Amino acid sequence: CYNFQDFRSLAKSKLPSPIFNYIDGAADDEVTYRRNTSSFDDVSLVPSVLRGVKDVDISTTIFGKKLEMPVYCSPTAVQRLFHYEGERAVAKAADKFGTMFGVSSLGTVSVEEVSKISSSPKMFQFYFHKDRGLNNSMLERAKAAKFDVLALTVDTITGGNRERDLR
């Protein structure tokens, strides 16, 4: 793959259509999806020319942790729908490239297992549930697994109105 569209086409050819549409789709009329995607067309990557490239350093620091590159692997629910290793694969990739990744509280691999796979900085994305015991258990497990950051998701854990799926 040479660009985003190549990667998207490859995914569409390899994944069952319900899985592809889950990843590729969005809620309602997909207006925000189209805006987010088209925003990449508004960015120009302008190279610095006639400059040395011997010591290029794209590392950054976030939450007091050094990342080798300013790319973050965002948490996504039920990752094993998309790849047989799910969060394991993301943890390995983040570790290999020295960047941060997140694990959803709706993940398919335990926080304990993910923590053993990667020494990279990790974020636990937490959905608040009605069951306080479940909440406490998830938070304690993430803390014990040495997750660096907690992200509280405040929208909802119910699915959106995904019109593409209804069609």
Please give the residue ranges for each predicted region:
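An N-cap/entry alpha-helix motif that binds or orients negatively charged groups
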Residues: 1-67
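Residue-level signature of catalytic and energy-coupling elements of molecular machines
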Residues: 16, 73, 94
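N-terminal active-site wall of soluble small-molecule enzyme domains
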Residues: 59-70, 79-91, 107-119, 158
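Hydrophobic faces of well-ordered beta-strands that scaffold small-molecule active sites
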Residues: 71-74, 99-103, 122-126, 150
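Active-site mouth loops of central-metabolism enzymes
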Residues: 72-84, 124-133
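Alpha/beta enzyme core
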Residues: 78, 91-92, 96, 113, ...
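Catalytic domains of carbohydrate-active enzymes, especially glycoside hydrolases
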Residues: 89-101, 105
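Short secondary-structure boundary segments
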Residues: 105-106, 154
